[in-house]
Design a protein with these regions (language model features):
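Acidic-basic catalytic patches of nuclease active cores, encompassing PD-(D/E)XK
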Residues: 1-30
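Short glycine/proline- and charge-enriched loop/turn segments
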Residues: 3, 56-61, 118
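Conserved catalytic cores of phosphodiester-cleaving nucleases, focusing on short active-site segments
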Residues: 20, 41-60, 69, 77
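Mixed-charge, glycine-accented linear interaction segment located at domain edges/termini
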Residues: 32-34
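Short hydrophobic-acidic sequence motifs that mark active-site Asp/Glu residues
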Residues: 38, 42, 49-53, 94, ...
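Mid-chain, well-packed structural core segment of small domains
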Residues: 62-91
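Domain-level recognition of nuclease-like catalytic cores that cleave nucleotide substrates
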Residues: 87-121
Length: 121
């Protein structure tokens, strides 16, 4: 089950990167990890460095992707972003959530809809 969840999550992140590139975001980093926090995608859009949490769903059985980015998750993302920003200096930051919804088709995840929530928290 864990391998399945990871492959669906990876497919969602790949779809989010393609979506963001079409929207003229410059991808700076992916899967940035520190102890206690991870950021799925770090991108640049205009004057902002954007820290993006991606949630991939094949059903609403466990709630929407946006609902999964609760206060605890937000705090972990913010902590990781603070560490990342140390190497960038004084920049403006924003926190977005990208929700990728789709269906499992055989062994592949087929994207049906992408919702991008800017300034999510």
């Amino acid at each position: 089950m864990e391998k399945y969840k990871k492959s669906v999550g990876n497919a969602g992140e790949d779809a989010a990167v393609k979506y963001l590139k079409r929207k003229r975001y410059i991808i700076l980093d992916r899967n940035f990890n520190i102890h206690g926090g991870e950021i799925d995608i770090i991108a640049k859009k205009g004057d902002y460095v954007v820290f993006i949490e991606v949630k991939t769903r094949s059903s609403d059985e466990y709630g929407s992707g946006a609902e999964a980015v609760n206060h605890t998750k937000q705090q972990r993302i913010i902590k990781a972003a603070q560490v990342y920003m140390l190497k960038l200096g004084n920049v403006s930051a924003r926190f977005d959530v990208v929700v990728v919804n789709g269906k499992i088709n055989g062994e592949k995840f087929k994207v049906e809809k992408i919702d991008h929530i800017e300034n999510a928290f």
